[in-house]
Amino acid sequence: VTVYCTSKYGCLALTHCGALGLAEHNITVNGYAPGVVVTPLWEQLDKDLVDIGFKEKEGQAYDDIVRDALQIKRVSYPKDIVGTASFLASDDSDYMTGQMIHVDGGWCIQ
């Protein structure tokens, strides 16, 4: 968990520092922070964690534990994230900089 949290905050700091450093060149720097996104890597991780007995509730897979912790009671799929990435790459976001958009089903407001 420590490495995960450190990397998330590293992305936030990089976004802020990049925005500060590049603003004078009229370059914007923003980011998005996805939560749990179901991909083949996530599906394998979920299976591996169940296989080694890592679960907080009896009979419940890690995927279910994460889903229960989200405000929106479902994990996301790549289709849920792509709109935010497209927005940030478009001219519609040209007046924002230094922002991190959390696309995490409410995880960060717990």
Q: What does each model-found stretch correspond to?
A:
Residues 1-3, 17, 41:
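Conserved catalytic loop/helix region of short-chain dehydrogenase/reductase
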Residues 4, 12:
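Catalytic tyrosine of NAD(P)H-dependent dehydrogenase/reductases that use a Tyr as the general acid/base
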Residues 7, 15:
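Active-site helix of classical SDR
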Residues 23, 28, 96-98:
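Short, small/polar-rich loop/turn modules that mediate ligand/substrate recognition or access, typified
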Residues 28-38, 89, 102-104:
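Conserved SDR Rossmann-fold cofactor-binding beta-strand/turn motif
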Residues 37-69:
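A glycine/serine/threonine-rich, flexible loop-to-helix segment
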Residues 57-58, 70-81, 92:
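A conserved structural motif in NAD(P)-dependent oxidoreductases
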Residues 85-86, 97-110:
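Short C-terminal tail/terminal secondary-structure segment
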